[in-house]
Swiss-Prot record:
Enzyme Commission number: 6.1.1.11
SUPFAM superfamilies recorded: Class II aaRS and biotin synthetases, tRNA-binding arm
Protein name according to UniProt: Serine--tRNA ligase
Organism lineage: Bacteria, Bacillati, Cyanobacteriota, Cyanophyceae, Gomontiellales
Organism: Cyanothece sp. (strain PCC 7425 / ATCC 29141)
PANTHER family: SERINE--TRNA LIGASE (PTHR43697:SF1), SERYL-TRNA SYNTHETASE (PTHR43697)
Catalytic activity, as annotated: tRNA(Ser) + L-serine + ATP = L-seryl-tRNA(Ser) + AMP + diphosphate + H(+); tRNA(Sec) + L-serine + ATP = L-seryl-tRNA(Sec) + AMP + diphosphate + H(+)
Biochemical pathway: Aminoacyl-tRNA biosynthesis; selenocysteinyl-tRNA(Sec) biosynthesis; L-seryl-tRNA(Sec) from L-serine and tRNA(Sec): step 1/1
């Protein structure tokens, strides 16, 4: 959530920064904030007058002036104030609720270091790693064809079980998926991340804290009877472990890694990536989540990108790092790097990880704070997260980049101990 005080004190500066992301009308928020504060002042003044009247009545009663004509007037005024305060209470609550709902729809301010641009065409390439294999003809099968040829992927039967955009992994395919998950978790825990296995069903409050609700409700699957949602990413349950808590500065930084299946409706992607493992309603992912001191969040963000990149390098998969421009940032992010892996069958890079720094945006929504030793008050932590990695897309990259002339797929050396074999 945005800092309302910052908006109130510097509306033009705030508006200019937000305009780098697109058009947003902040006037309704400023109007609601003004009305709410006016009601607060009125209530405060009435309460002060009520207290003064009560004191006057008490003094007159104590002095024995129970028949003082002024008492009747004071009691009448006190009654009127009580009625007015009772009328103000629902109005104030309504304004507060409306203001909060409006604030929840405003995205995070972009970092000053985020490149300014309208859309993904203006994203900035930071670096590349590895050598891209460019097929001379059709000697590289798309991963879905290779998977079906090897008998390890089945999409047709998945449609029968569920609908389109689901996949069934069979035999060595299921084993490769498990191996990738375990390999990723092993690497991240060795790097200092504490593993978490959270609930896969989450409530609306959790999704609101991390920014998926209320704006992106149509992107997630909901269990209507229980107000529970299927987790779109482990970022949500892991970050919410600390919702409504006050940590100590000594607790920071906190590093977590988590494997979860992820569920997304992909409502805005009709007609895109209709085949294969790239865009599914259900997919596995290993997520990295950090809660850090604000003074270190920029360094922690760069380290997060390195930790996610290390998995691709260990698997010897060519990739590039893209810094997203302001017009392509996710709703909650202030700064974001995407890792894109090379898919030779398409001759292009595809996103496999998104590493975001949210600053205090999520912490403000989720009330995740910390206290410095010996200091008064609390501060909001900074939260970060990144995929480490999307497992299905990693499998797709392996099935394409490791194809052999004899029609087999070589297993990356670091995965061979997990599978006990060298090829698929």
């Amino acid at each position: 959530m945005i800092d309302l005080k910052l908006l109130r004190d510097n509306p033009q500066e705030f508006s200019d920064r937000l305009a780098k992301r697109g058009k947003f009308d902040l006037q309704p928020i400023l109007d609601l904030d003004r009305q709410q504060r006016e009601l607060e002042v009125e209530r405060s003044q009435l309460q002060a007058r009520s207290n003064a009247i009560a004191k006057q009545i008490g003094e007159k009663m104590k002095s024995g002036n129970k028949s003082d004509p002024a008492l009747e007037g004071l009691r009448a005024e006190a009654g009127q104030i009580k009625t007015t305060l009772a009328e103000l209470e629902p109005k104030e609550k309504q304004l507060k609720d409306e203001l909060e709902q409006q604030l929840l729809l405003i995205p995070n301010l972009p970092s000053d270091s985020t490149p300014v641009g309208k859309d993904e065409a203006e994203n900035v390439e930071v670096r590349r790693w590895g050598e891209e294999y460019i097929p001379k003809s059709k000697d590289i099968l798309p991963h879905w064809e290779m998977g079906e040829k090897l008998g390890i992927l089945n999409f047709e039967r998945s449609v029968k079980i569920a609908q389109s955009r689901f996949a069934t992994l069979i035999g060595a395919g299921a084993a490769l998926e498990r191996a990738l998950i375990q390999f990723m978790l092993d690497r991240h825990t060795s790097a200092g991340y504490l593993e978490v296995l959270p609930p896969f069903l989450i409530n609306s409050t959790s999704l609101t804290a991390t920014g998926q609700l209320p704006k992106f409700a149509e992107e997630s699957f909901k269990c209507e009877a229980d107000d529970l949602w299927l987790a779109p990413t482990a970022e949500v349950p892991v970050t919410n472990l600390y919702r409504d808590e006050i940590l100590t500065a000594e607790n920071l930084p906190i590093y977590h890694c988590a494997y979860t299946p992820c569920f997304r409706r992909e409502a805005g992607s009709y007609g895109r990536d209709t085949r294969g493992l790239i865009r599914l309603h259900q997919f596995n992912k290993v997520e990295l989540v950090k809660l850090v001191h604000p003074s270190t969040s920029e360094q922690e963000h760069e380290a997060l990108v390195r930790d996610a990149s290390a998995i691709l390098e260990a698997l010897q998969l060519p990739y590039r790092v893209i810094e997203l421009c302001t017009g392509d940032l996710g709703f909650s992010a202030a700064k974001c790097y995407d890792l894109e892996v090379w898919l030779p069958s398409a001759g292009c890079y595809r996103e496999i990880s998104s590493c975001s720094n949210f600053y205090d945006f999520q912490a403000r929504r989720g009330k995740i704070r910390f206290k410095e030793s010996g200091q008064k008050g609390t501060q909001f932590v900074h939260t970060l997260n990144g995929s480490g990695l999307a497992v299905g897309r990693t499998m797709a990259a392996i099935l394409e980049n490791y194809q052999q002339p004899d029609g087999s797929v070589r297993i990356p050396p670091v995965l061979q101990p997990y599978l006990g074999r060298e090829t698929l």
